[in-house]
A protein has these predicted regions:
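N-terminal acidic leader/helix
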Residues: 1-31
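Short, charge-rich amphipathic interface segments used for partner binding and complex assembly
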Residues: 12, 30-66
Length: 69
């Protein structure tokens, strides 16, 4: 993976996860509870998939791109 592509991908992954966090917070406003739980149960796996299949592979090649460092 070329570094410039990794940089651009990381920027997009960070935007994506930020947007998923907005969605997670909005889901907390959903009623009834059954609907909220149905939506919410899918958010964890989506965040995990972003981490496992996007974030970590980029950092494997370019650990210096880790925004948490």
């Amino acid at each position: 993976m070329e570094k410039q592509i990794a940089i651009e991908l990381m920027q997009e992954v960070l935007k994506l996860t930020a947007q998923l966090n907005v969605i997670i917070h909005k889901i907390q406003e959903v009623s009834p509870e059954a609907d909220r739980l149905s939506l919410d149960r899918h958010m964890g796996p989506m965040m995990a998939a972003c981490d496992e299949h996007l974030f970590r592979p980029i950092l494997k090649h370019y650990p210096e791109l880790d925004p948490h460092r």
